[in-house]
Amino acid sequence: MAARDLVFQPGDRVRTSGRFVSGPDGDWLDLQRVHDLTIKPPGWKSDLSIRLIGADAAAVPSEFGPNQVPGHITVVGRWHAPAPGEQVRLGDESIEVETQTPEGPPPRPRADRTHPPCLPPPGGWPQNVVWYEGWPQSAVSDLDLDIRDLESSGAMVHRAIFRPSEDQEVLVVAATDVEAVTRGLSPSLPNQLCVVRSRFTRAQLDEVRDVLHAHFHEWRLEVFGTGSSDSQGQPFATAEPVRVTPELAAWDDTLPKGLLLLSPTITPPEIQHPDRQAGG
């Protein structure tokens, strides 16, 4: 699926999930996914809220259930917004609700980190974890190595801890210079290190980060970063826009496949799980 498949225009049908808010100024769906710990007054909504037309306040769930969070709903309906290029203010965008279900936002995808992408050493990965007051401790999780040279040179692109079992920890490193990283880390992590050749360089990830930062407000990004990796330990960048605009999609299509994962809050209705690897 290409990024352009996530683009929609005024009048198109869309799907989204969020927190239902009702007040004197009407019904809203607050799409904010990243929250701080401050207590908000009743009826508060973020600047990522969309006006709802025809929502059923009585059908909003008040209790937890399977894939159900109090106050949260999923809607499908017609998208209304100013023409492209016009300034968007709170309340200018709305969804004319066709269907409403008591479903919360879909969970963020999480990579499986139980199977390191390297063959285990003879005898298997060591039982190297000691639990202390409910927290795992090992040479991997307590890593105290000077890796600044490996990171600054670009030899080490990303590192993550894999846990084949609760008593095992393996450091998985995606590297552009496998030999240098192996030579630098293996003496301190015998039989606890897995180094794979990175699909992307640190420079590629940094360039994506810089572009996302420069267009943060224009593309209405809620959060972005370059610290993620998949089940093979391969790094990628992430971005969570409210929606994928034509401009964001055009830039995304220039990227190598797998370099960026887009997770828009609002999508065309046929797309159930918008998390996808970009550049395709």
Describe the residue ranges of each PLM region.
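OB-fold and OB-like single-stranded nucleic-acid-recognition modules
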Residues: 1-235, 240-280
